[in-house]
Amino acid sequence: MTHKERFFTAIHHEEPDLVPVSAGLDMKFVELLTGKKAAKEMGAHHGGGLEEGRTVSPLEFHEANLENQRLRFEAIQRLGTDLYSVSDYNIYPKDYVPKMLDDRTYVDFWGKIYRLAPEVNTNYWIDGVIKSEEDLDKFVPPDPEEMNYDIVDLAVKLAGDQYPVVGGIHLAGMFPYLIRGGLDKYCRDLYLNPRFARRLTKMVGDVQLKIAINVIDRGVDAISESDDIAGKDGPFYRLPIFKELIFPYIEEMVRICHRHGITYLKHSDGNLYPILDALVALGIDGINPIEPQVMDIADVKKRYGQKVYIQGNVDCTWILPFGTEEDVRRDVRRCIDAAAEGGGFVLSESNSMHPNVKFENILFYVDEARKYGRYPLRR
């Protein structure tokens, strides 16, 4: 089977030749796998082109993103995994470059503020620009028709008919609280100034929905909607808030995906159990990553495996960063034993192959998946 055939067989709840394997690689590992130097990385949130104390042009920033996307494809080929992803973090307005506020701090076109951390080759979110209704009144959101989708076109071209291209997108579940300056502020708004929270959420959701539609129109094979809406203690909001503000965008995106014949994977870290029935009822096709510290992948497979495919959940909090080879291999087997029977399963890490993961553990992860994840499964 090709990688694409393997993926589609699995997500349609049939058994392929092998369990499909996904790995969300930090650029650190892309460099190690390809032996090539990537453009200066901005972590998960942009493809490259920025570094401390240096100004880059829009063209240089864009070309850095495209080159890093090419290297990601070469890396998955060398690693032997099955899914090729492209993120909406690398879709931005034409002639855009993040605005540097100082040598280490920048703001993106959505008003999310990040701090560069060159010592660990990544960045992290710190704030947002919308502090009041007056700020929202003045804010000009990006135009979905004026965005640069070159990176999606490149991914689809490179993948051809061999690899499935998964478009990573965001809707209304996460960007509003990042732009607002924090989940705590956004939650206060929901109760003390709900009109403000609703306006902000609608502004973001409407734009991101149109961006996602444009990504679909460029030929991706699946959508992975990546809004984190829960923590280890449970969902961020009560179910009525989800139903009013967040779920309508998911439901509409599911309809659009199905109209185009592609699948919709819902990603969120944290404990989703309190809202999982409601999420599945929206018509989503898959759930990821089923965080192992707070959710049981075998239980999720048993309860929901006839309706959704399962993607997860080798532990990237402890085992992949700190575990031994046998720890990694054992955790891969745990996931396959729990969820792979009958298809409907894609093996992945429980969030990402972040910079603190040990490189050799990524190799053990894939090797064990290929050895143990051969259908018919061994018991």
Question: What kind of feature is each model-predicted range?
Answer:
Residues F73-E74, N90-P93, C335:
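Short linear loop/turn motifs
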Residues R72, D103, I297:
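Generic structural marker for isolated residues within well-ordered, non-membrane alpha-helices
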Residues N68-S87, R218:
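Catalytic domains of carbohydrate-active enzymes, especially glycoside hydrolases
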